[in-house]
């Protein structure tokens, strides 16, 4: 096993599925990372391994964080990509959850480590969660689209296939690495309203969790997420109502959503490229920011 993979224990797993989510460009409104974090909590997941961040991050961009423990001791936290294992209720299989951060460098090596561990654990399906900005209203359920390494997977899991072409993130690179290794892989994408892109989107997280549960054939109690969705919707609605132009725009999106149902228009390659440029510019500004303390 590669040195970059730090494995504390090897769990005994039953027909495991790997579920991944990465903070960063593939995590609009933090929908994917919120979903994965909720699943880890709901399923009682336990950490068993991680990836050494040393070779995969520019620490001037993805800086480590210092925090105080009991008001005295300083704790240093590095960018983390951690693997957790959990039993999935109601079905005879287990889950491996990878909660991480999109790396800055060496994406092919990074994804090869994930594939290597997947093969070692005899994982037979990889499901990557993502969330993207789209022309959807905050008052309706987040539509979910998907892609897969094989046409049979799209048909088997009833995915609404994506025809997107353009820039990609670590989810797309992992998807390709799985295909090259002969590992079945599916990606699920929830739509996040672009006009509230900076706010965490529990609605997107809920849609991803529900779609994943349906794909796996299990039931998921999501009362906590549903309550967060209600609060999110109320707060955004109040903010939107303060601007008549935005209110009118949202009403147009609502009308279109009601007509189209669960489908939505995936942004074009040019739109995604513009979003990538904006994201990278914001990351650069964050990396160049002055620290508040030593």
Label every model-predicted segment.
Residues 1-100:
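N-terminal short beta-loop-beta anion/metal-coordinating cradle
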Residues 22-26, 98-107, 157-165, 195-199:
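Flexible, glycine/proline-enriched loop segments at strand-loop-helix junctions
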Residues 30-34, 105, 109, 165, ...:
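Conserved active-site and cofactor/substrate-binding residues in soluble primary-metabolism enzymes
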Residues 49, 96-98, 127, 184-189:
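Hydrophobic/aromatic beta-strand patches that form the interior of the parallel beta-sheet core
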Residues 93, 101-152, 174:
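Internal, conserved structured core segments that host functional sites
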Residues 135-215, 219:
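Catalytic cores of processing enzymes, dominated by hydrolases/peptidases
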Residues 196-294:
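A conserved C-terminal secondary-structure "cap"
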């Amino acid at each position: 096993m590669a040195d970059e993979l730090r494995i504390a224990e090897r769990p005994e797993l039953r027909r495991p599925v790997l579920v991944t989510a990465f903070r960063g460009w593939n995590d609009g409104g933090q929908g994917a990372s919120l979903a994965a974090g909720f699943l880890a909590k709901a399923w009682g997941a336990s950490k068993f391994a991680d990836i050494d961040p040393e070779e995969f991050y520019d620490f001037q961009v993805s800086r480590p964080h210092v925090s105080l423990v009991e008001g005295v001791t300083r704790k240093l936290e590095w960018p983390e990509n951690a693997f957790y294992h959990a039993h999935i209720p109601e079905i005879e299989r287990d889950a491996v959850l990878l909660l991480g951060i999109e790396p800055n460098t060496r994406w092919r090596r990074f994804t090869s480590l994930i594939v290597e561990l997947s093969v070692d654990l005899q994982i037979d399906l990889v499901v990557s969660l993502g969330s993207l900005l789209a022309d959807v209203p905050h008052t309706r359920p987040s539509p979910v689209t998907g892609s897969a390494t094989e046409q049979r997977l799209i048909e088997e899991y009833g995915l609404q296939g994506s025809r997107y072409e353009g820039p990609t993130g670590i989810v797309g690179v992992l998807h390709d690495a799985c295909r090259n290794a002969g590992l079945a892989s599916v990606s699920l994408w929830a739509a996040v309203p672009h006009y509230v892109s900076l706010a965490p989107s529990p609605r997107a997280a809920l849609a991803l969790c529900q779609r994943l549960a349906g794909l796996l054939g299990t039931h998921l109690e999501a009362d906590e997420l549903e309550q967060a969705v209600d609060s999110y919707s109320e707060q955004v609605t109040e903010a939107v109502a303060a601007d008549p132009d935005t209110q009118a725009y949202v009403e147009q999106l609502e009308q279109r959503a009601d007509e189209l149902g669960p489908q939505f228009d995936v942004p074009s390659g040019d739109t995604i490229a513009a979003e990538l440029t904006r994201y990278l510019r914001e990351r650069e500004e964050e990396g160049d920011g002055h620290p508040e303390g030593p």
